[in-house]
Amino acid sequence: QTITATHTYILGDNDSRNDARQLCFLQAKQQVLEQAESVIQSQSIVTNFELTKDQMTSYSAATLSVEIVKEDVGLSNGQYTLTLTVKTDVDVDQVNSLLAAIVADTTLADRVAQQQQQIRELEGQVQTLNSRLSVATSGTANALRKERKVVFENIAGLDRMQLVAT
């Protein structure tokens, strides 16, 4: 089953288009993963694994790949916007196999949980940096953008690692 989500990001004065794309992708990805989690829970044998909601969220995110399928740049009330549509394909049988493998291997389960926790913390850092950037002067904006770029790179690195783990 293919699940899609769309999110629109309003660019601030200190946002580049690339920054906006990454910020928008994080939000759209979160939306599509939440929808996928509902599908997985309703159409699978996940209940037999006796997973907590946090475990289900972490393991589902680790087993799914999200891709951008559409990007639109626009103008709304005098501000630039970037709208992304993302998708993930949910093969419940494949997800169940991966979930079973994760649950069966406590080392892998711990590693996946740690990666997802790190991603959530980094996403929180992005939001904090975004808030600071929205009121930053031109003098401090460059340093904040560089810091945010490093956080984006760290998130991407963790995303790549989870694909290897599963």
Language-model features and meaning:
Residues V39-V95:
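Structured, amphipathic secondary-structure segments that form assembly/contact surfaces
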Residues T4-T57:
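Short, well-ordered alpha-helical segments
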Residues T2-I10, T83-D89:
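Soluble periplasmic/extracytoplasmic beta-strand elements of cell-envelope proteins
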Residues V32, F49-K53, T57, A61, ...:
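Short alpha-helical interface elements
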Residues D72-T166:
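Pro/Ala/Gly-rich low-complexity, hydrophilic intrinsically disordered segments
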